From Swiss-Prot:
Protein name, as recorded: Transmembrane protein 235
Lineage: Eukaryota, Metazoa, Chordata, Craniata, Vertebrata
Post-translation changes: N-glycosylated.
Species of the source: Mus musculus
Family: Belongs to the PMP-22/EMP/MP20 family.
Keywords, in A-Z order: Endoplasmic reticulum, Glycoprotein, Membrane, Signal, Transmembrane, Transmembrane helix
Gene Ontology CC terms: apical plasma membrane; cytoplasm; endoplasmic reticulum
Pfam families (alphabetical): Claudin_2
The encoding gene: Tmem235
Amino acid sequence: MALLATLLLSAALGALLSFALLAAAVASDYWYILEVADAGGLGGVQLFSHSGLWRTCEGQNSCVPLIDPFASAGLEVSPSVQHLLSLHRTVMVVLPLSLVLIVCGWVCGLLSSLSQSVPLLLATGCYFLLGGALTLAGLSIYISYSHLAFVEAARTYGVTHVQNVHISFGWSLALAWASCASEVLSGALLLAAARLLSLSQRPGVPHSVIL
C-alpha cells in the first residue's frame, strides 16, 4: 500500500500548499500593477502603483484602502460602476471563502485517509475539484473586473489620459493561479487514491495490483 500512502500524503501536502499560496495572494498587494510612462516618449516612469484586493499603493509605501464595495451598494452611481462594485464584492467573498473551503477539505481528507473510506475519499476529492473551480471562478471574475475598471476609467477621463498607461497583473495573481492548480491536483490525487483503495478491497485482486 505504499502507492496509496504516497497519493494521500501528496494530496495533503498539495492542499496545504494551496492554502498557503492563496492566503499569501489574498493578503498581498500585487494583483494589479499600473505604470504611467513618460508623456514625452522617453520611456521613463512617472507613476507606479500596485493594488490588492483590499488596498492600492503608490510606489513602495502610501497605501490607501479601496472603496468598500459593500458600503457603496446604495450609492447613486452609473450602472457600469454598479456592475464594477458587484464584481468587486463577488471577488472579496469568493476568494476568502475558497480559503475556508480548503481548510475544511483538508480536515475531511485527513479523516477519510485515517478511516480508509472509499466514499469519503471520493467525496473529498470531488470537494477539492469544486473548490478549485470556485477559486478559478473568483480569479476569472477579478480579471474581468480589472479590465472593465480600466475601460471605465478610459471612458470617464478620456482615452488621451490613459494612452501612456501600462497595466499588468502581478505575482499575487500568479500565486492564486498556482493555488488553484494545487487544489485541483489534490482532488485528482484523492480520486486516484479512492480508486486504488477500491481495487484493493475487491476480493480476489492480486497483491501486486495494490502495491
